[in-house]
Amino acid sequence: MKKIYFLVVICILVGCKKERPEITPIVKKKVPAIILTDERKVEIDTATINVFKSETLKQFYIASENQTVWGNLKKRAFVLLQLEKSEELGLEPEDYKISQLKKFESKVTTLSDKDLAAYDILLTYNFEKYLNHIYKGKLDPKKLYTNWDLDAKEFDVNSVLIKGFNKNKLDSVVENIQPKTQIYKELLKALEIINTFPDDHVKTIEAADKIVLNDTNPALINIKKRLLYWNDMSGKDSLTTIYNQKTFEAVKRFQERHGLASDGVIGVGTIRALNYSKESRKKQIIANLERWRWYPSELAENYFIINIPDYSLNVVESQDTTLVRNVVVGTSKRRTPIITSFLKTVVFNPTWTVPPTILKEDVVPAMKRNRNYLANKNITIYDTSGKVVSPMAWNENKPNNYRYVQSPGSDNSLGLMKILFPNHHSVYLHDTNHRGIFGRNNRSMSSGCVRVENPLELAQHILDVDGNWPQDRIDTIIASKTTMSFKITKKYALYQWYWTAWSKKNQLIFRADIYDLDSDLYDQLRN
């Protein structure tokens, strides 16, 4: 009975937490043979492997001719250490059964052949699970969201692990498969930084009115405690209720780190950010680490990267940031989709066809109130045969029977240009006829497309590869009010992504979670 104790434990562990066993598609690529050393080896009963219902695990042990592989103490110790310190990567060690594995290890010299085989399988299964998680994340974004359009990250975990195993370079495997992106590294640093902060016990800040320099307000005591806690204010402070210059400067530093208007005025947004606890911020960092494992592990040589919650677009060429632009993104109801694509075409003087959502929610109600609504916006109605329909002849009961097209010009909703890229959401980058909004702090205002500040300069930058695009050429095209399209010959990837935390120069940086994704993602990671 004692001999099969650990095998029984394995069966229980596989079924606990109502966790579905990982079912991996059959690996068609031939798995390299595992080079076994002279340490103790035992035969493995394939029935024990089948408990896990994992084709990947089955193929792994076929490569060892169904013998145990982890007889080497150094290799086992390395794997156990990686799983134990997986929390440094924002992962949960118990997801990899670390406690049970350590119990096996503590009795490894006295384990029966059956129990040794059980330990070997459990170690392989959980180490491969860990490798999959650090390469492409624990969760699948396409199962979580309908508007995340990311390419699947393919990973042959058996081949990668076995090659590292045979060359005694398991450490290189762990290092090399993690994302190489700078933001991922900054997030790991952010997790390291936040773990150095003590537990916080500052009370929730309550302030109904804005607080400005030299005001007196009882909320300032807890505000100052928060600023001291987060190191935005240094040294000793009397913790008075007076908003003095020292606190004013600290508030501006805090606001800048959180993407708020750094004007020193303590309003609702600043209070909300100050009220985040250490634990909440740590969860936010962990959620963002997961996202960056979903994204490509390496970025293209030239690319546009949009951070939706930061309302920013950066153009990066050969690892150099060459342009930075403010952007406007979708509202929480009409969210900007997350996309990986490539730039294809610049369109000057674009027309704008009213999309279904805007037609239903905005245009139809407005037309029912005022039949001249579309005419006032220079929008023409066409029937299914392409004939122009007058506003008075428009059938308000069948609005989907028409096409609504806005003529080119500075008043066009897309402004003077748009940049197209392949995607399934009918979105693009474009100018706007409301150019004053880029000065606002909260720019979650569009219907899903991304509006770009000073887009004509951006267009010239990406088109002018051979010096054939001087500014006056663009000016002439714009003045013609004729729609013209030009292929982008230089290769630019487009990364339209979402992240709300990172670090910079050993400082924690956060942004408002405008689509309320962070908390739910963390909960699912820990489910």
Regions found by a protein language model. Name each.
Residues 2-7:
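Sec-dependent signal peptide recognition
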Residues 12-15:
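C-terminal motif of bacterial Sec signal peptides marking the signal peptidase cleavage site
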